[in-house]
Curated annotation (Swiss-Prot):
GO function term, MF aspect, one: protein-lysine N-methyltransferase activity
Main location: cytoplasm
Name of the protein this chain belongs to: Ribosomal protein L11 methyltransferase
Species of the source: Limosilactobacillus reuteri (strain DSM 20016)
GO biological process, one term: methylation
Amino acid sequence: MDWTAIKVITSSEAVEAVSYILTDMGAQGVQIEDAADFANLHEGKYGDHGEFIDPSSIPHRKNGAAVSGYFPQNVFVPELLPTIHQRVAKLREYGLNPGENDVSAATVDNQQWATVWQKYYHPLRVTDQLTIVPQWEEYQPADPKEKLIFLDPGMAFGTGTHPTTRLMLEALEKTIVGNEYVIDVGTGSGVLSIAAKHLGAGKVDAYDIDEVAVNSAKKNLALNPVAKDVKVGINSLLDGIHTKADLIVANILAEIIVPLIPQAYENLKPGGKFLVSGIIDDKAPLIRQKLQEQGFIIDDEQQMKDWHGMIAHKPTEVK
């Protein structure tokens, strides 16, 4: 079976959003070539976070990024290309730079798609304790504290390579003490839910508005026995959810975090933590303001490239 590869030339900051658009339009998998990722690699075998990568083996760009979605060959390309172009262009409304937004199509054979792309994915140590491993890789932990998260990166919903995901994983590692009730909003690949379980969380509920993302999360959860009891469902943010969690996490765009803030406040226990990422530079003041207006206290803020992650808590004595 041949495939239609639709490539979008974009910016590094828009990689995850463009990946989502392609998957939402029917792509069966996504390949990313990001100049920022290549620039972060050390000379030699190991990457910035201990990943096993030979830089010379990676096709790379000098600037920007290219995201390729792989579609069944029978898709109607003349209709698909302008639709993708329009959706990528609208990313400006969310504070993201769509870059060149050049969209093109080519035919690739099954061998190219099914196996060749896998050689560019390798184990990636993203935090002090967490390493993301492609499901087909055989990998042994380097030390007793290293915990492995197995993912199928073919469906690119936050696979650990983007700064927003790394910021959130680092925040989880700082925050989880043990046995917390965690809600993962906009779960995507399920990576945050899996990480939470590895770090000692108790009950974990995960939600996403997108059915494709929910199915992707379920597949990844099944690869990780530690996360076998995580519940995943389709839901828009926390609409209709009425509970009291210890920790709520969300790696989503700032414009979507804004309506989530009051919902998170209502669904947290006093003293509960709210972890957010996916916040581009110029939106960080807005999120700080909205968190504080709601009554949250911001405990920590970290930045990676142009992205921010924040840890806030609900006061124990609510006015």
